[in-house]
Amino acid sequence: MTDVRHEADRSRFEAVVDGTTAYLSSELSSGTVVMTHTVVPPPIGGRGVAGELTRTAVAWAREQGLAVDPQCSYVRSWLARHP
């Protein structure tokens, strides 16, 4: 399992794998977390990092009582598979 940190001051969730940083960017807007972009560099792709970033970000939003607006296509497809 990948360790994901919420970097609130940078408006994103981050994971560092083998020294390479992946992240999911978000914005807070009127009780909603707008998930805008997911970046997983090729050297760490295919390891489930994007899924862990998304799972953690969505769980955090739900714990805070916030709605999720999946503007990122990866987050949108992940939510369709994990309602």
Locations of regions flagged by a protein language model:
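Short, charged, intrinsically disordered terminal tails
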Residues: 77-83
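Conserved acetyl-CoA-binding loop-helix of GNAT-fold acetyltransferases
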Residues: 46-59
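A conserved beta-strand-loop-helix scaffold within acyl/acetyltransferase catalytic domains
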Residues: 13, 18-33
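Conserved GNAT acetyl-CoA-binding A-motif
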Residues: 60-73
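Conserved N-terminal entry element of GNAT/NAT acetyltransferase domains
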Residues: 1-6
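A short helix-loop-beta-strand connector motif used in the catalytic cores of GNAT acetyltransferases and
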Residues: 7-13
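A short, internal acetyl-CoA/4′-phosphopantetheine-binding micro-motif in the GNAT/acyltransferase core
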Residues: 38-45
